[in-house]
């Protein structure tokens, strides 16, 4: 019987076993060697298939789907450099915890290292970046179906975070008629598994949450709560929990905590704030990937008696290497096990400092249309019952420092490796998972880097506005002590482009806004009318970085 038919049976079983572990979305790039996987995914009614012609963007599309759905997402690509293009998304997932199941089709062993076309060494292709890897053999009916499903089940049961790389060699022929009866006995050997929804092998892993026995004593001390990347529900709970304790909470742009002490990356430069925070006896950090420069500096320099870092990702997440406790736990479960004890705030003056800072920023930016004003006013543009995706580089730092985002409002970003690749693709994946209106904001170089991902936005399930802040290059380098003589040529790299033609090429609406009123009205109209709009905001190249530096320099002069 045909090899192509058994390839299909093998791939059908592989895909079906993944659905038993919650895989609903599969992202597929075109390719011949991956034909058994692609056709099997298309035939599986439990799977939603997404396609993209660029594997780098495809990986980030899957990353966004996994980020928003909190479910494992599968990726199917062909052999060769197609598989290599998934590397950035796999690295990001390894750092931020999204579960990706990467199915790379491969040539059989006899075609490796002999000059065969599109054949590379795919064993351990992604080095240490996947959490797990499974190298499958060439499909053969001599291997029982129970081996394949139990191998997948075992790997998926251990995939708590990051990527699982499953390398899938297929021999030719890859195409051919399938009469539907061949090799059915191989599948039928699994019995009533086919009519169930359970994995073949159910591994039970129980990890009891370890309560800190001295928490009743520490919660009566002077504490500070730092919140990095957590979920909307966790951010809201943390805000209420810290408030009951009377502890100041400093929230990152991805904290979704409502940032009760807004503009922290500005007011942390005030000496009075530093003096008060120095009195903290315990610091609790929830989530990693802090953004703000002043916050990172304070976190590094603080010397409490105890430093606890709570996150469900394992490993070291504290670049300052504090002595303390690294607690691997779900944030919500940890809060339930460590209730607050109501007490009076010990650092009330920080509320006054933050309020004064926010008012001064309002005044400073009131008549200055530009990147900083846009960042500060982002909350006014958010769609009701929607979501925000924040790009990297300068824009995320400005929003982190200047805006106060609503508590519990979903905010997404790629702050693991913090690259500018794949941001639009990730945004597209997030929205496909939620089907909610979305506001996205990226810089011009980020948009150029992922320009062909505009093709993914044509299938947006809800209104979407993508703001491209065009400051003509990588102006994050204007914040850094890069050599002035070489800054433009070798760091900022201005491209002198506008995005109207790109939007037209992909059939997207396009607006260029030159003032706040036009920008705000355009966004409001988009939420009402639907569709996808690329909104380009051309700003003075150095204005955003210069404004941030000005505000940090001035904060010490503001009386509180």
Curated annotation (Swiss-Prot):
Its cofactor is Mg(2+); Mn(2+); thiamine diphosphate. SUPFAM superfamilies: DHS-like NAD/FAD-binding domain, Thiamin diphosphate-binding fold (THDP-binding). GO terms for molecular function: 2-succinyl-5-enolpyruvyl-6-hydroxy-3-cyclohexene-1-carboxylic-acid synthase activity; magnesium ion binding; manganese ion binding; thiamine pyrophosphate binding. It holds the Pfam family TPP_enzyme_M_2. It is an enzyme of class 2 (transferase). Keywords: Magnesium, Manganese, Menaquinone biosynthesis, Metal-binding, Thiamine pyrophosphate, Transferase. It catalyses: isochorismate + 2-oxoglutarate + H(+) = 5-enolpyruvoyl-6-hydroxy-2-succinyl-cyclohex-3-ene-1-carboxylate + CO2. Pathway: Quinol/quinone metabolism; 1,4-dihydroxy-2-naphthoate biosynthesis; 1,4-dihydroxy-2-naphthoate from chorismate: step 2/7; Quinol/quinone metabolism; menaquinone biosynthesis. InterPro entries: DHS-like_NAD/FAD-binding_dom, MenaQ_synth_MenD, MenD_middle, THDP-binding, Thiamin_PyroP_enz_TPP-bd_dom, TPP_enzyme_TPP-bd. Its EC number is 2.2.1.9. It comes from the Bacteria. GO terms for biological process: menaquinone biosynthetic process. Binds 1 thiamine pyrophosphate per subunit. Disulfide bonds: none annotated. Catalyzes the thiamine diphosphate-dependent decarboxylation of 2-oxoglutarate and the subsequent addition of the resulting succinic semialdehyde-thiamine pyrophosphate anion to isochorismate to yield 2-succinyl-5-enolpyruvyl-6-hydroxy-3-cyclohexene-1-carboxylate (SEPHCHC). Belongs to the TPP enzyme family. MenD subfamily. Homodimer. This is 2-succinyl-5-enolpyruvyl-6-hydroxy-3-cyclohexene-1-carboxylate synthase. It comes from Pectobacterium carotovorum subsp. carotovorum (strain PC1). The lineage of its organism: Bacteria, Pseudomonadati, Pseudomonadota, Gammaproteobacteria, Enterobacterales.
């Amino acid at each position: 019987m045909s090899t192509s038919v058994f390839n299909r049976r093998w791939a059908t079983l592989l895909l079906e076993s993944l659905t038993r572990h919650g895989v609903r979305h599969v992202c597929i790039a075109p390719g011949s060697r991956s034909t058994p996987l692609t056709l099997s995914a298309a035939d599986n009614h439990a799977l939603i298939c997404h396609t993209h012609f660029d594997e780098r963007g495809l990986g980030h599309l899957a990353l966004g789907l996994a980020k928003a759905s909190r479910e494992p997402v599968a990726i199917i690509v062909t052999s060769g450099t197609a598989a290599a293009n998934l590397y950035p998304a796999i690295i990001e997932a390894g750092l931020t915890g999204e579960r990706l199941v990467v199915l790379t089709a491969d040539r059989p062993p006899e075609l490796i290292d002999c000059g065969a076309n599109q054949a590379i060494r795919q064993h351990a292709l992604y080095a240490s970046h996947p959490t797990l890897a499974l190298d499958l053999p060439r499909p053969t009916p001599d291997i029982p179906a129970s081996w394949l499903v139990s191998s997948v089940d075992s790997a998926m049961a251990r995939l708590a975070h990051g990527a699982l790389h499953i390398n899938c060699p297929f021999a030719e022929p890859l195409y051919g008629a399938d009469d539907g009866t061949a090799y059915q006995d191989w599948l039928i050997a699994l019995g009533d598994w086919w009519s169930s929804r359970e994995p073949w092998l159910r591994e039970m892993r129980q990890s009891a949450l370890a309560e800190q026995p001295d928490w009743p004593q520490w919660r009566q001390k002077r504490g500070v709560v730092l919140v990095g990347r957590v979920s909307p529900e966790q951010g809201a709970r943390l805000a209420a929990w810290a408030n009951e304790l009377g502890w100041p909470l400093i929230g990152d742009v991805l904290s979704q905590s409502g940032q009760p002490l807004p503009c922290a990356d500005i007011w942390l430069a005030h000496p009075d704030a530093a003096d008060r925070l120095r009195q903290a006896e315990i610091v609790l950090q929830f989530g990693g990937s802090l953004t703000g420069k002043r916050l990172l500096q304070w976190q590094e320099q603080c010397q409490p008696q105890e430093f606890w870092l709570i996150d469900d990702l394992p490993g070291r997440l504290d670049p300052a290497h504090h002595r303390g406790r690294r607690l691997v736990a779900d944030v919500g479960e940890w809060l339930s096990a460590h209730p607050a004890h109501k007490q009076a705030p010990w650092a009330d003056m920080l509320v006054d400092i933050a309020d004064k800072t926010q008012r001064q920023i309002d005044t400073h930016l009131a008549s200055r249309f530009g990147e900083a004003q846009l960042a500060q006013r982002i909350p006014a543009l958010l769609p009701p019952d929607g979501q925000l995706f924040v790009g990297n580089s300068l824009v995320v730092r400005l929003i982190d420092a200047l805006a106060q985002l609503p508590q519990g409002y979903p905010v997404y970003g790629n702050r693991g490796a913090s690259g500018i690749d794949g941001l639009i693709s990730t945004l597209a994946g997030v929205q496909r998972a939620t089907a909610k209106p979305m506001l996205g904001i990226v810089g011009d170089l980020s948009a150029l880097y992922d320009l062909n991902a505009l093709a993914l936005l044509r299938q947006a399930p809800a209104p979407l506005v993508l703001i491209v802040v065009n400051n003509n290059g990588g102006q994050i380098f204007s914040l850094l002590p890069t050599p002035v003589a070489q800054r433009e040529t070798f760091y900022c790299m201005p491209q002198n482009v506008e995005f109207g033609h790109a939007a037209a090429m992909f059939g997207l609406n396009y607006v260029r806004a030159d003032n706040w009123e036009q920008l705000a009205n355009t966004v409001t109209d988009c939420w009402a009318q639907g569709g996808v709009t690329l909104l380009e905001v051309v700003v003075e190249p150095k204005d955003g970085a210069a404004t941030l530096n000005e505000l940090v320099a001035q904060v010490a002069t503001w009386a509180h």
